[in-house]
Amino acid sequence: LIPFYEAGLDAVIVQDMGVFNLIRKHFPDMDIHASTQMTQTGVYGSRLLKELGATRIVTSREMNLQEIKQLDERLDVEIESFVHGALCYCYSGQCLLSSFNGGRSGNRGRCAQPCRMPYDVYDNGEKINNRNNSYALSPKDMCALQILPDVIESGVYSLKIEGRMKNVTYAAMVTHIYRKYVDMYLERGRKGFKVDKQDIDDLSDIYNRGAFTTGYYDSVKGKKMMSLLSLIHISEPTRLDVIS
């Protein structure tokens, strides 16, 4: 970490409490962001992390916007929350399926994504699914673009977009589109906020798993959050914009 620190590293995202303590001890002025893999779903755990030195909490994907709002109202700490990308079928940071199934730890950034594989589902020895719903553990990707005003007004300080194992085209386009609508909301407010269908189509074209979902932010959707039919859909962007 020393060469990165000396080069001006802004902050580190940490999941392991031992690493957290090590960084706080040896780099006391380094900002620590508590990773979503810490499964912070409420005020009390987040307060403890702040007392230990965390400057930002990356909330669990399983929190709804009301819970995030309560966190913002009761705790003076930066909040970062996911708005676009993959959802885990398990609680953030608590899935060990990849470790068991292939020795690749999700908390070390090496998840093999066994949840994206097709499975046969049995009830009392009888198979109850078929090839039309065989991806029983695979959630749709999150897209919170339509509810961005609600996300911002809940107290979220920073929007998190999935980037791991994604190419530069994906990162550039998704960031560009979200930047456009953050600026729109800040300039026009809620009444002037309107999402162009073409931008949703572009997000869908570049990467999606059958359809998008807003995740847990506005409700618990259960089966509606799952991409049961197809594993993944990828295509080239239908429109290219100049990213400045």
Placement of each model-derived feature along the sequence:
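N-terminal active-site wall of soluble small-molecule enzyme domains
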Residues: 1-48
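Hydrophobic, secondary-structure "cap" segments at the distal end of domains
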Residues: 62, 83, 89-149, 153-154, ...
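Active-site-adjacent beta->alpha loops and helix N-cap segments on the catalytic face
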Residues: 15-27, 62-75, 168-170
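Structural preference for beta-strand elements that scaffold enzyme active sites
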Residues: 11, 31-33, 56-58, 78-82, ...
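Single conserved hydrophobic/aromatic residue that forms the stacking wall/gate
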Residues: 232-236, 240-243
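Conserved, mostly hydrophobic/aromatic
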Residues: 16, 49, 81, 161
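Catalytic cores of alpha/beta
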Residues: 43-52, 66-73, 90, 145-154, ...
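Extended, domain-scale alpha-helical bundle/helix-rich regions
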Residues: 144, 150, 158-191, 195
